[in-house]
């Protein structure tokens, strides 16, 4: 009995890519989303390439997918793209049990995340 989802309509100068069910916790993935938010796509790709975080590969793949969507589906100029939004949502949490001493059990939680990246084409001011 949750509210109806209202999808955010993309503007003409925007493109989006979504990665669902990434096997990493939302808190860890959000660190990388904060890293690329508001940056030009070339800079964001460079930062992700040299990041030592495990999720950097998944974020980079999603960003490259958003760039391809912008270029092929929306006919946007790749050099003018900026990461307008990069946000993380919680997905399901798989619960497992690990046997412990004296017949007890410990709870293991394996969280999943959704990653959404929205790119926006920003007009470059004319050089005089």
Curated annotation (Swiss-Prot):
GO terms for cellular component: cytosolic large ribosomal subunit. One of its GO terms (biological process) is translation. InterPro entries: Ribosomal_uL22, Ribosomal_uL22_bac/chlpt-type, Ribosomal_uL22_bac/org-type, Ribosomal_uL22_CS, Ribosomal_uL22_sf. SUPFAM superfamilies: Ribosomal protein L22 (SSF54843). The keyword Ribosomal protein applies. CDD domains: Ribosomal_L22. GO terms for molecular function: rRNA binding; structural constituent of ribosome. Keywords: Ribonucleoprotein, Ribosomal protein, RNA-binding, rRNA-binding. HAMAP family: Ribosomal_uL22_B. This protein binds specifically to 23S rRNA; its binding is stimulated by other ribosomal proteins, e.g. L4, L17, and L20. It is important during the early stages of 50S assembly. It makes multiple contacts with different domains of the 23S rRNA in the assembled 50S subunit and ribosome. This is Large ribosomal subunit protein uL22. It comes from Methylocella silvestris (strain DSM 15510 / CIP 108128 / LMG 27833 / NCIMB 13906 / BL2). The lineage of its organism: Bacteria, Pseudomonadati, Pseudomonadota, Alphaproteobacteria, Hyphomicrobiales.
């Amino acid at each position: 009995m949750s509210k109806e989802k209202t999808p955010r309509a993309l503007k003409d100068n925007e493109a989006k890519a979504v990665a669902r069910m990434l096997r990493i916790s939302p808190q860890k993935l959000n660190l990388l989303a904060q890293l690329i938010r508001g940056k030009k796509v070339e800079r964001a790709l460079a930062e992700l390439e040299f990041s030592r975080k495990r999720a950097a590969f998944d974020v980079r793949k999603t960003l490259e997918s958003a760039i391809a969507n912008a270029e092929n589906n929306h006919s946007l100029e790749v050099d003018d793209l900026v990461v307008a939004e990069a946000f993380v949502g919680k997905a399901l949490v798989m619960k497992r049990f690990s046997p412990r001493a004296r017949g007890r059990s410990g709870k293991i939680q394996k969280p999943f995340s959704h990653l959404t990246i929205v790119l926006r084409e920003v007009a470059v001011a004319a050089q005089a």
